Design a protein with these regions (language model features):
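Polytopic transmembrane helical bundles with strong interfacial aromatic enrichment
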Residues: 1-39, 50
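Short helix-terminus and kink motifs of transmembrane alpha helices
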Residues: 28, 32, 36, 75-83, ...
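Membrane-embedded alpha-helical bundles of multi-pass integral membrane proteins
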Residues: 37-109, 113-116
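Short, charged low-complexity linear segments at domain edges
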Residues: 90-117, 151-171, 393-402, 421-433
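Non-transmembrane accessory domains of multi-pass membrane transporters/channels
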Residues: 95-146, 183
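Iron-sulfur-cluster electron-transfer modules
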Residues: 113-116, 122, 148-150, 157-341, ...
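Cofactor-cradling patches in redox/metallo enzymes
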Residues: 262-357, 385-401, 405-501
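Hydrophobic alpha-helical positions that pack around
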Residues: 380
Length: 501
């Protein structure tokens, strides 16, 4: 029997089942029913292979299996074959964005820019919907649906092929949708077949940004602020200098144990400064030596996640030069975004630094701090970049439990719900639909805790606004875990409390 005949028989079988059993999705459900039914019949009834019933069940099972194999490649059940390969070929680690290769690599612009892994992942999607169930954008009325990203790529490849020069964004994938992603990683964490949604989305963003297709006023202003001012807030570096002088922060000279990375929020944002100064009070109490960089710019996290690798590279190279000049050995930061970018993304810029989040430091030294006077009910919010990205869950909880009565929210740890700031979205203007921060604030307020503990300055800002909107008259106060730890310290005469201003 030649290949053409086999193809025709397969086509005839598929069409026949489509019209006879339309409710069974081209007969696949019936085939699966026969496969499982005959297997269970043989197992439960203990049929003798030589008996008539045994032979009938064997032939039915074998026929269903032989029919199922050629049909599977034309249906969504193809994932049964491709998913193990996808998992095996995944990049390893969580949401690792591949570097651009060469001057002509602009990201995912057309089908020809996609790799075999991208195509493989598109056809591996089970269509289970677990990614969309946990996506903060999808669950707050945005058009982004991570499942549809994979299915859109699949439709593109079916229509045009992987080597096509047709643009990816347009008929099958929405530009608006890909820029609604907070890069929280919930989709990637939940996917049972290992589809790496975030590298796909960032690749598509790269293509839109590098070709000039994405024309967003807020995004353009953000990139200009990063280039001109070195921070996404557009603040002058003189403000950082004034803060360092006013707060009497020592400069790092290579002899201290830690280089305290201020970050943009720690250097310029009032709430971020309060969190940073709380950490410095604890470090001073513990007798740990530290210093700060004289000059420091944004790590490039927002630029990287929004697809502007040029700005990211410029910022990374400047900061790497500053750190290498003072021979920095060990860094500490209050910002999980900074920790992830410095510890992971900067490796592609040729640098490797040891850096830890302040929750790890505080948890390690928790036993050395005085016991708290009172323990207020406090609910902890897991930041996406501290939890799913850095897999740090227990340490911040230990800090909270050491200072307060720890309360847990329903969606927590690996399944925590995003605050809405990641992926550069904190700087892209008003959201469509419900604000992600408001959705999370409703969950946190429902615990009836008097205090919300954060471990990320972006979460702190987003949730502060969200809680105020949800409960304008009696909103829970929000504090950083460093502030909880610092509150356990004895008050010293003449202590400075207004250095964040």
């Amino acid at each position: 029997m030649d290949a053409l005949t086999v193809h025709r028989l397969h086509f005839a079988f598929t069409v026949t089942f489509h019209y006879i059993f339309p409710q069974l999705t081209m007969g696949l459900a019936l085939l699966i029913l026969i496969l499982m039914g005959t297997y269970l019949a043989e197992y439960r009834l203990r049929l003798e292979p030589a008996s008539g019933a045994g032979r009938l069940v064997w032939w039915m099972h074998t026929a269903a299996l032989l029919i199922f194999l050629p049909v599977i490649v034309r249906t969504k059940h193809l994932h049964l074959l491709l998913a193990p390969v996808t998992i095996f070929l995944s990049r390893g680690g969580f949401s690792r964005i591949p570097p651009l290769v060469g001057e002509e690599d602009f990201g995912l612009v057309t089908g020809s820019d996609s790799t075999r892994l991208v195509a493989l992942q598109a056809f591996s999607c089970v269509e289970c919907g677990r990614c969309q169930e946990h996506c903060p954008a999808y669950n707050t009325g945005k058009i982004l649906n991570p499942k549809e990203i994979a299915l859109g790529l699949r439709s593109y490849f079916k229509a045009h092929g992987a080597g096509s020069e047709e643009p990816l964004l347009g008929e099958y994938l929405s530009e608006e949708a890909i820029f609604q992603c907070t890069t929280c990683g919930a989709c990637e964490y939940q996917c049972p077949v290992g589809i790496e949604h975030l590298p796909l989305l960032v690749g598509l963003r790269r293509g839109a940004v590098n070709t000039g297709q994405w024309e967003d006023a807020h995004g353009g202003e953000l990139f200009l602020r990063l280039e001109r001012n070195g921070n996404p807030l557009g603040m002058s570096a003189l403000e950082r200098d004034k803060f360092i002088k006013r707060a009497e922060l020592p400069l790092y000279d290579g002899t201290q144990e830690y280089l305290l990375w201020l970050g943009c929020m720690g250097a310029y944002d009032p709430a971020g400064r309060e969190s940073l100064l709380a950490l410095t009070r604890v470090m001073r109490y513990l007798g740990v030596s530290w210093g700060v960089l004289k000059k420091e710019k944004c790590t490039g996290d927002a630029a990287r996640r929004l697809g502007n690798d040029l700005v990211f590279q410029q910022l990374a190279e400047f900061n790497i030069g500053q750190l290498q000049a003072v021979r920095a050995r060990k860094l500490i930061s209050i910002c999980p975004h900074c920790v992830r970018t410095i510890g992971e993304d900067w490796k592609q810029a040729g640098a490797s630094f040891e850096i830890e989040h302040h929750s790890v430091f505080l948890a390690r030294h928790d036993a050395k701090l005085p016991a708290p006077g009172t323990r207020e009910r406090t609910v902890y919010h897991d930041p996406c970049y501290l939890g799913r990205y850095l897999e740090t869950y227990d340490e911040p909880r230990a800090v909270v439990a050491g200072a307060a009565e720890l309360i847990e929210v329903a969606r927590r740890r690996e399944r925590s719900f995003c605050c809405g700031a990641g992926g550069g979205l904190a700087f892209l203007g008003e959201e469509k639909g419900t604000r992600v921060s408001r959705e999370r604030a409703v969950e946190l307020a429902a615990t009836e805790a008097g205090t919300v503990a954060a471990a990320c300055p972006f979460c702190h800002t987003m949730l502060r606004d969200g809680l105020a909107a949800v409960r304008p008259l009696n909103a829970p106060q929000i504090v950083d875990i460093a502030q909880l730890a610092a509150a356990r310290l004895p008050r010293t005469p003449g202590a400075r409390n207004d250095d964040s201003k």
